[in-house]
Amino acid sequence: PSKALLKSAELFNKIQHSEDLGITVKGVDYDFSKIIGRSRNVAGTMAKGIGFLFKKNKVDHLIGTGTINVPGMVEITAGKDKGQILSTERILIASGCKPRRLPDLEVDGERVMTSRQALEMKKQPKSIVIVGAGAIGAEFAYFLNAFGTKVTLVEMLDHVLPVEDHETAAVVEKSFKQEGIDCRVSTAVENIKVNAKSVKMDLVK
């Protein structure tokens, strides 16, 4: 779904800069809720498509929580297919990523949200601090900035996209700064205070 958001942001950004190509476009606007809704629809369509391919190629697709109690055996302990036990020679764990939460900070899905919750945000924020400048954080920074949100991107390590090489990261960081994203590297977030209207914090080098 994040790639669908990026597609909308990329198109809007190109229209905003169309005069560079000699094309004048007036009266362009966007509907944030529709952009979010489209990304969810795309995700749903893809999931159905994958399900069809599984069935077509005779791949068993079980839904639930897999638990490995003994080597070579997986038990579905919760979910639709609870109770099924699979015996196999090899087990490949590809469970995806889980957002890491900051200690002593309650995630309410409104003022403080995980990346998964951000995929379903109902209202565009006027400003946002994104903690973590990895691929997911960078995607959200680009998306929200393209539609006018004031974005501060914070990373504890010394460059954005910390798992990528420095040269690639430097190009991305330079581009972000040119687009107006406030990139804070080698920076930690401390003293976070959340109230009904805003979130305040200290950014410490």
Residue ranges with predicted function:
Residues 131-134, 164:
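Glycine-rich Rossmann-fold phosphate-binding loop(s) that bind the pyrophosphate
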Residues 1-124, 152, 157-161, 165-168, ...:
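Glycine-rich flavin
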Residues 141-146:
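Gly/Ala-rich phosphate-binding loop of Rossmann-like dinucleotide-binding domains
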Residues 137-138:
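N-terminal Rossmann-fold NAD(P) dinucleotide-binding loop
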Residues 148-150:
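Conserved beta-loop-beta element that borders a ligand/cofactor-binding pocket
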Residues 129-130, 153:
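Hydrophobic Val/Ile/Leu positions in short beta-strands of Rossmann-like dinucleotide-binding domains
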